[in-house]
Amino acid sequence: PFVTTGDNVLAVMVYKWSDGTYLEDQDFWRLSGIFRDVYLLGVPKTHIRNAAVTAVPDDSFKNGLLSAEVELASYDGSAAALLRAKLLKNGRLVCETQIAAGIEERKNACVTFDMTVENARLWTAETPELYQLLLEIEQDGEITEVQRVDVGFRKVEIRDRRLLVNGV
């Protein structure tokens, strides 16, 4: 359904360096280009390009504060879309928000939102409590894309020369 008669766009991005470059260079092979498996991902013409999510507890370590910056892109002229964000815990809806966004053709639109989760279950290595953030794009009453981001509320800090996770 994504390849049609006429002109189609296939974009390939190759990163020469990454934060894993040092590990990959341990065998002293310094190659650039594509030398591993490649996957093609079909996306709708208006889609989620990137999502950056931060989830931390508040100062009392009781409630969770979630902030997200979602980048939307459109390849089909100017588009109006509704971004709906649902936060789930074990399949149950914890909180929800929605934001209307207008996207110009071949440009990106950045949408930001915040959520507060009362009595949030905090993530630790011993109790890896995760929430599921569902990001949905709706156009003309139809959901065209859904992306899931697993998030955990935690705060890691160094205080008084001690490494603390969630204040402990």
Task: Specify the residue positions occupied by each region the protein language model found.
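Secreted/periplasmic carbohydrate-active enzymes, especially glycoside hydrolases
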Residues: 1-168
